[in-house]
Amino acid sequence: MKNRTLISLVSLSLITACSSNTPEFRNVSVHDPSVIKVDEMYYVFGSHLASAKSKDLMSWTQLSSGVDDGNVLIPNVTEELSETLRWAQSDTLWAPDVIQLSDGKFYMYYDACRGDSPLSAMGIAVSDKIEGPYKDKGIILKSGMAGPGDDGEKYDSAVKPNVVDPDVFFDKDGKLWMVYGSYSGGIFILGLDPRTGFPLPDQGYGKKLLGGNHARIEGPYMLYSPETSYYYLFLSYGGLDANGGYNIRVARSRNPDGPFEDSEGKAMIDAQGTPGKLFDDPAYSPYGMKLMGSFQFMNTEDDPEASGTGYISPGHNSAYYDDKSGQYYLIFHTRFPGRGEEHEVRVHQMFMNKEGWPVVAPHRYSGEKIGKYTAKEISGGYAFINHGKDITADIAGSKPIELTADGKITGAVAGTWKLAGDHTAELTINGVVYSGVFLREWNEAAGSQVMTFTAASAEGVSLWGSQE
């Protein structure tokens, strides 16, 4: 679901390099960023026709923002997409996705929604160039109608999907799919024609993967890992605003159309709300591995003034796997402590733990590569964050712990830790084992390189640590 109330301000902040070892960041506002790489350039496309590009995933340039005539992506958007906007009773567009098909053209899957109901339409616009201009090819799906839906059955908003939040992808065998949906009847997947990008015939809304009964689950994104041979379905739970408890989760399957399971082996098709109840979060919050929610690394007496850092309601992510370097990236928008509804794009590196589940680096990506570390480098004091499993607007604040030289964890939590191989991390806290990695990365707030860890349990809880 997209932010309708916020006029997405271009929030540019440049952190200039004061030495060759200091990364340079330029921040942009693109809500619900969907990533595509073209000619060594990364592009993100988001709600309200916002877009940006970057060569390094750190320094971004804003390309567009606002559903207004003159937007470089669709210059005459109010006329070009008038049918979609009329149907959805909206003056803006929600999260799109862009993919390049075999004809070399770029296909934008756009959508609009009324917002207080699933009255939505989704269509395709095509361009010869990634930066546009895009020309409309027509609507492919509608939802929220009073009568029969696109599948010929009476539209029931608790059962049928809200046709927004598309992610279009090729599977490992070259078949084209679209996963989509927000709240309402859940997350669905459709097979697409790889030549035209349009849905294959006789599918209706496609196959349901999870959700329903107005469960607050949306923003699906699929990533295949040749390393594990799994399809990873990323999802956002909760509400997108600063008080909504937005958080990022993941499930996996051997097949693009499921069935999907979480890290406990629970079937994601059961992740749904209670019939007759609206937004019954406790019914589905136990499902899906939670990668990240609202958090804050708290200041200590030794920190620079106001160096505490954190995110509020991070979510609606996309992801990218670099088959040359073997690196994974998580791209998402987030709000920030004390900054209201202002949002920016962030990129964090991801890693697969020994169980084949993604874990997310605690700090934003700054060009780091994982290395070989020693126990001596790792031992010391850390700011520790437990992301938990619930859907909550509460901020998970860091607590002090120490990884002692003899393999113990002391402080706010107690347990043991060990380093295996070059960088594999294993932490045991209260009898629960968390698997992940150690990683040296840039702490933007402190202005220095620090050792970190990221790990997750079979119960789907993620832990972070950042050395103090």
Predicted segments with their positions:
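Carbohydrate-active catalytic/glycan-binding domains of CAZyme proteins
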Residues: 18-468
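Bacterial N-terminal signal peptides that target proteins for export
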Residues: 1-7
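Low-complexity intrinsically disordered segments
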Residues: 2, 12-13, 448-451
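Bacterial N-terminal signal peptides
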Residues: 8-16
